[in-house]
């Protein structure tokens, strides 16, 4: 039986001399107590040495992934196939690949593991020609290379540098503010007008460092820092200043403070450039989405880029506003809509009405960019630029929607225009060019009004006729009551009908055409009454 043993120096193939002793697994370690005993159990048949660490790294990465290296394939074809013996391997997965590709029988068992442990303990005595110092150096180099490969370590992707840089930048800003405030107050006793004329802090300190006492402003040239107009104003103010006189020692201490301010300002500029470059190297997509400072503060708040990538979009949105969040939860009020992400340019340029909506969308896209930067192999910022363009388009739509609501053009723009085919021939309407008086719409309305007046007059005439007839009938009915002592039921009904007709108002729109005409029976009765009277 042959044994494949991998070392940091090369591949070793051993021949098992006494296979009977392999049956006793528990006592096999006793056979490898000394190099002499080990040489009685196994014997080196072939040793394939690596040329350098790169070759060793390629071989071991292939072994870890369960693949056969070209160099190993050559050794197995040359040595093992000719021997026609089974091959003992430490990895069962590797044995399956060797059996599949080279058609060699492989063995993997607890006995093989114990045999490998014994060979490893006496490796220096079993492999001649390899010095212990060389073996140790190769082991150390291969260990570093393997760990770097497995962790996919990159010197550029060290987010610890970002955490420290942004913290130092914040500290420098605080120190600069304190120093500049102290410098302005201190020198303000001597020349108070200078602080009102020069608003820039760095320019103020540079002018102060160059001139010192206000008496020297008349002869000093400040064209390096100030424009001609401001320089003339400073010189004029120095002549009529209301400040007190100070000693040379005071001026000296103020100048030392100005030197500190200038040096810290220059270092801050250098540190900001370093932070920009480091952010573009580690998280280019996050930098495009929210900027260098906001991205660095998010990473610093989470601790690292990997920790930040594990957060949800809703967490990233309110990251940095934990105090306000827990205060709102405790008092049962509305929770904050944004934290550190509020300082991003996309949220800053939005109107207050849409800040919450944009911060939510920006947090969702920023989380995608963070995960792409943390786990992706590509180092380009194309994905971040594409997502930022989408957010800007969405922001424009939201802003336009608000403008349309104010102007009232939203419904007009929402209506689809009528489709007109290009082949349609459009004719010119000449009616607009005519200067002759035409019938206006007002005249048509007047004609309609006249017709309405005519119909109303006819309706009134019909009403008057109906009323006259009803009155005549009422008089006739009264006369009949006088003549006849007992009126019949039919006459009462007729009277009721006549009263009902008198009470009902007739509509003006539909004039009543059916008039109450007396029946022929009534006419006969009237004639009889007249004859009786005669």
From Swiss-Prot:
Q: Which stretches of sequence are listed as region Disordered?
A: 470-534
Question: Which cysteine pairs make disulfide bonds?
Answer: none
- One GO cellular component from the entry? cytosol
Any GO BP: snoRNA localization
Q: Which UniProt keywords apply?
A: Isopeptide bond, Nucleus, Phosphoprotein, Ribonucleoprotein, Ribosome biogenesis, Ubl conjugation
GO function term, MF aspect, one: TFIID-class transcription factor complex binding
Crosslinked positions (Glycyl lysine isopeptide (Lys-Gly) (interchain with G-Cter in SUMO1)): 467
Residue stretches of biased makeup (Acidic residues) = 470-486
- Composition bias, kind Basic residues: at what positions? 490-500, 522-534
Q: What is its main location?
A: nucleus
Q: Does the keyword Ion transport apply?
A: no
Phosphoserine-modified residues are 109, 304, 351, 507, 519
Renumbered to this chain, where is the cross-link Glycyl lysine isopeptide (Lys-Gly) (interchain with G-Cter in SUMO2)? Answer: 157, 353, 411, 415, 422, 426, 441, 444, 465, 467, 490, 502
User: Has UniProt tagged this entry with the keyword Nucleus?
Assistant: yes
Assembly, in brief, is:
Core component of box C/D small nucleolar ribonucleoprotein (snoRNP) particles; the core proteins SNU13, NOP56, NOP58 and FBL or FBLL1 assemble stepwise onto the snoRNA. Interacts with NOLC1/Nopp140. Interacts with NOPCHAP1, NUFIP1, RUVBL1 and RUVBL2; NOPCHAP1 bridges the association of NOP58 with RUVBL1:RUVBL2 and NUFIP1. Interacts with PIH1D1. Part of the small subunit (SSU) processome, composed of more than 70 proteins and the RNA chaperone small nucleolar RNA (snoRNA) U3.
Cited function: Required for the biogenesis of box C/D snoRNAs such as U3, U8 and U14 snoRNAs. Part of the small subunit (SSU) processome, first precursor of the small eukaryotic ribosomal subunit. During the assembly of the SSU processome in the nucleolus, many ribosome biogenesis factors, an RNA chaperone and ribosomal proteins associate with the nascent pre-rRNA and work in concert to generate RNA folding, modifications, rearrangements and cleavage as well as targeted degradation of pre-ribosomal RNA by the RNA exosome.
Q: What's the protein here called?
A: Nucleolar protein 58
Q: Which organism is it from?
A: Rattus norvegicus
Highest classification ranks of the organism: Eukaryota, Metazoa, Chordata, Craniata, Vertebrata
**Gene responsible for this protein:** Nop58
